[in-house]
């Protein structure tokens, strides 16, 4: 069985996700789709000869030749060009989507042969699919943490609707009473400085360390940090939460479904309210959690300097139970089931 994929090859969530499946041997053939924001593609991630799609449409003689030997096309979140999966069906190629519920269209223009849902929340949105968790990447190494001393937030490129809660975390710094050591990592510093200006922190507030630039996951979740803070507003799948936990960090995120089903509950941040929204017009309606900066600050103060070894050990168990060795065969069986 030959499994094709069209994907980003960038040091961001979808790029890392596709590379993980390729490195595990689930995906056999790749077309790289150039990121619309101009983020460089890491063509070296894939074999020599892998082509890069530089237009919005996925069509043409090279694409047709690519499909000649493909049995199943696997997509992550989006096919980029909705005409392409329809063309796959015309060519007799099966289509499988690993969806991110918040980015799925209310009126999709293609009927996928199978949904492989990465979270229990995605399973609720796509009940005809099957739920298989995303495995932890092998390069995520576990390190024992014993005390909550150094806190980390990964803002990335901020994301749609500030869904990572970066602005709320920054606003919380005005209310933190303890001596907090917080680092915020981001792709580009402009976005963080804009949020810092918007937050209007008073004199004397905690000043975070800002580190900008592309970073590999193994560097992000290294032993330098003890606690990962991410007051996320929505998400079914969150690779940073998963990888931080698997690396041995204590994870402080919003107490919401489905992350509260697999993360330790004690450090989770209470939700002030919930509302129904859309990430963009035409997409599925979703529930968004609202978190109060004062509550975030109280949680940071509560855990700063506290013992966290039991959470670190739980992360080690999670890493073992959610390895590629545990789940690769389930993905292969799911893909074979559509043939």
Model-derived regions, located:
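Conserved donor-binding/catalytic core segment of Leloir-type glycosyltransferases
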Residues: 140-164, 170-177, 183
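Short beta-strand->alpha-helix junction loop in the catalytic core
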Residues: 35-37, 121-122, 131-141, 189-190, ...
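Short hydrophobic beta-strand element within catalytic cores of glycosyltransferases
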Residues: 250-253, 260, 270
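Aromatic "clamp/platform" in nucleotide-sugar-dependent glycosyltransferases that forms part
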Residues: 233
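Acidic anion/phosphate-binding donor-loop and adjacent secondary structure
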Residues: 107-108, 126-150
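A charged, aromatic-enriched C-terminal amphipathic alpha-helix characteristic of glycosyltransferases
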Residues: 287-296, 304-336
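Nucleotide-activated donor-binding/catalytic signature segment of Leloir-type glycosyltransferases, i.e.
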Residues: 193-216
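Extended catalytic core of nucleotide-activated donor transferases of GT-like folds
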Residues: 4-5, 31-125
């Amino acid at each position: 069985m030959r499994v094709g994929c069209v994907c980003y090859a960038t040091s961001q969530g979808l790029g890392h996700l596709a590379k993980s499946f390729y490195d595990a041997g689930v995906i056999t053939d790749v077309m790289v789709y150039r990121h619309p924001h101009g983020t460089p593609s890491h063509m070296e991630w894939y074999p020599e000869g892998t082509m890069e799609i530089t237009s919005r449409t996925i069509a043409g003689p090279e694409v047709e030749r690519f499909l000649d030997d493909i049995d199943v096309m696997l997509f992550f979140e989006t096919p980029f060009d909705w005409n392409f999966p329809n063309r796959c069906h015309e060519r007799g190629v099966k289509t499988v989507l690993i969806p991110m519920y918040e980015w799925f269209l209310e009126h999709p223009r293609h009927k996928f042969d199978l949904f492989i849902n990465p979270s229990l929340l995605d399973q609720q949105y796509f009940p005809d699919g099957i739920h298989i968790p995303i495995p932890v990447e092998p390069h995520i190494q576990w390190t024992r943490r014993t005390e909550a001393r150094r806190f980390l937030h990964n803002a990335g490129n901020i994301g749609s609707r500030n869904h990572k809660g970066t602005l709320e975390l920054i606003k919380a710094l005005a209310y933190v009473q303890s001596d907090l050591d917080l680092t915020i990592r981001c792709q580009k510093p402009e976005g963080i400085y804009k949020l810092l200006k918007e937050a209007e922190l008073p004199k004397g507030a905690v000043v975070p360390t800002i580190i900008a630039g592309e970073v590999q996951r193994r560097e992000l979740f290294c032993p330098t940090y003890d606690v990962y803070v991410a007051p996320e507003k929505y998400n079914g799948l969150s690779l940073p939460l998963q990888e931080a936990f698997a690396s041995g960090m204590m994870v402080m995120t919003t107490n919401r479904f489905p992350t509260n089903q697999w993360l330790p509950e004690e450090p989770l941040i209470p939700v002030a309210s919930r509302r129904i929204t859309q990430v963009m017009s035409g997409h599925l309606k979703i529930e968004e959690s609202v978190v109060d900066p004062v509550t975030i600050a109280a949680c940071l103060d509560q855990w700063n300097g506290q013992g966290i070894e039991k959470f670190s050990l739980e992360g080690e168990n999670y890493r073992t139970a959610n390895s590629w060795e545990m789940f690769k065969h389930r993905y292969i069986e799911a893909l074979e089931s559509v043939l």
